[in-house]
């Protein structure tokens, strides 16, 4: 403003001088000198104005290149101005309560089910990475699995239909297993998840085809027993192949079948080691293979030793506030019984299935992915979050070949059938409270600690995730 005013005054003076006739040589010289100074002043003003323009342009360029920092329900995000580099700090905590009804021998308890800090981001636009750890008390740690490190991988997005992921991550098998841990319908996943592999180390090719209507994944992994996770495989040179194809045939239509998803997955490989036991939704073990020194019949020891394959047809359907999810898993494993003398071998086929339904009373659109409440919880503004009702039924059946040589029929059940109901209160996208009732009937195992009676348990959870 001051520069513009100086220019205006100088222009007026110059105009006045030019309009006054010269009265003499001296006066003419003075006028010429004054006009010269005014011209110099105008030049200086122009230089200053250009300098200000350049400074403004530089400031705009600096602002354009400056990284962007944001905080919200998606976590703490640091992003370069061109979005080619992104760093996100996220995490979640789940605090659970387990309360057993009737004459159960299990103890009621509170526990930290999951405590998971997450670091993820993008490098050079196409290379995504993720590191997730877990410090909860329920983390399983073995000689081949650092239970603290759950995810540690890089995903190269060369094209939507051609992506290469390597590191430690979930094998592409179980439908509910692949669902995010902070987006579960029930406190604990269903029986099929216990037969599907969890996280494994390997490399996987995956992507979306045909306008996003088909997702595929195929990979090579170390291989893990049912429900297990591994970092490395020191004793088994064989690797597993895992594959999955999942289709949304009506995704790009406006029909009521738009939310239908159908798929099949499976694994094939060879495993060795101690086979896993199986537990109820209340985390009571109801089946275990015999375990001993392996020197005689009384101390028989069972080991996985040979071919393993899995097959899992799966589907879900969402329409408005309604959701339905179902899956079936067959897991076949060759086992060896050591009890002195020649080992006894057998191929086992264990199966599990579940069907789970959900409905949002508050009208939100249901989804396999996390749902955003229409109105976050805020009583002052008549906001009460989203209320979701859930129900499921499922079964796990153990191969009859296991009894009595490979498992004790008195203490281990031959199968378990369960049903449950529950409610999820989504206060907002980051906070959720869950309450479940689960009933489980056990077949066999009449003298087992967990299987001598049916299990009735109330499970509760408060979750914070960002």
For each predicted feature, which ranges?
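Bacterial N-terminal signal peptides that target proteins for export
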Residues: 1-8
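Bacterial N-terminal signal peptides
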Residues: 9-18
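Outer membrane beta-barrel
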Residues: 71-272, 349-382, 386-404
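Outer-membrane beta-barrel pore domains
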Residues: 103-104, 142, 153-155, 256-258, ...
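Residue-level marker for the onset of beta-strands and adjacent loop->beta junctions
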Residues: 65, 74, 150, 201, ...
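A general secondary-structure boundary signal
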Residues: 38-53, 92-94, 118-120, 151-158, ...
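N-terminal periplasmic/intermembrane-space "pro-region" immediately following the signal or transit peptide
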Residues: 17-94, 361, 365-376, 406-408, ...
């Amino acid at each position: 403003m001051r520069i513009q005013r100086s220019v205006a005054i100088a222009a007026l003076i110059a105009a006045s001088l030019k309009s006054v006739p010269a009265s003499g040589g001296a006066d003419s010289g003075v006028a010429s000198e004054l006009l010269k100074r005014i011209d110099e002043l105008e030049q200086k003003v122009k230089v200053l104005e250009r300098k200000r323009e350049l400074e403004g342009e530089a400031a705009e360029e600096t602002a354009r290149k400056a990284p962007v920092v944001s905080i919200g329900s998606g976590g703490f995000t640091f992003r370069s101005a061109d979005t080619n580099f992104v760093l996100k700090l996220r995490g979640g905590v789940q605090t659970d309560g387990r309360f057993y009804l009737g004459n159960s021998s299990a103890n009621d308890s509170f526990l930290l089910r999951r405590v998971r800090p997450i670091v993820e981001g993008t490098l050079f636009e196409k290379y995504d990475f993720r590191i997730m750890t877990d410090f909860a008390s329920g983390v399983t740690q073995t000689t081949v699995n650092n239970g603290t490190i759950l995810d540690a991988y890089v995903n190269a997005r060369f094209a939507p239909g051609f992506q290469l992921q390597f590191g430690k991550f979930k094998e592409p098998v179980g439908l509910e297993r692949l669902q995010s841990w902070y987006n579960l319908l029930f406190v604990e996943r269903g029986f099929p998840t216990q037969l599907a592999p969890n996280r494994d180390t390997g490399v996987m090719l995956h992507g979306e085809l045909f306008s996003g209507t088909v997702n595929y994944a195929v990979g090579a992994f170390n291989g893990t027993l049912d429900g297990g996770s591994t970092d490395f495989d020191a004793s088994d040179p064989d690797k597993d192949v895992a594959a999955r194809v999942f289709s949304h045939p009506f995704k790009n239509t406006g029909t009521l079948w738009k939310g239908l998803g159908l798929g099949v997955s499976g694994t094939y490989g060879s495993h060795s080691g101690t086979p896993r036991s199986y537990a109820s939704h209340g985390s009571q073990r109801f089946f275990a293979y015999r375990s001993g020194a392996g020197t005689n019949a009384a101390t028989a020891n069972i080991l996985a030793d040979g071919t393993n394959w899995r097959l899992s047809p799966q589907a879900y359907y969402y329409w408005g506030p309604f959701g339905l999810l179902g899956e079936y898993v067959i897991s076949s494993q060759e086992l060896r019984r050591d009890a002195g003398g020649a080992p006894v071998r057998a191929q086992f086929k264990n199966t599990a299935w579940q069907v789970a339904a959900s409905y949002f009373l508050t009208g939100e659109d249901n989804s396999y992915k996390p749902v955003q409440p229409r109105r976050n919880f805020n009583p002052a503004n008549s906001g009460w979050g989203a209320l979701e009702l859930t129900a499921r039924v499922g079964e796990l059946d153990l191969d009859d070949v296991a009894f009595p040589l490979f498992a004790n029929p008195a203490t281990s059940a031959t199968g378990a059938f369960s049903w449950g109901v529950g409610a999820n209160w989504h206060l907002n996208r980051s906070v959720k409270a869950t309450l479940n009732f689960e009933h489980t009937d056990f077949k066999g195992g009449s003298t087992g600690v967990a299987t001598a009676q049916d299990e009735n348990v109330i499970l509760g959870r408060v979750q914070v995730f960002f």
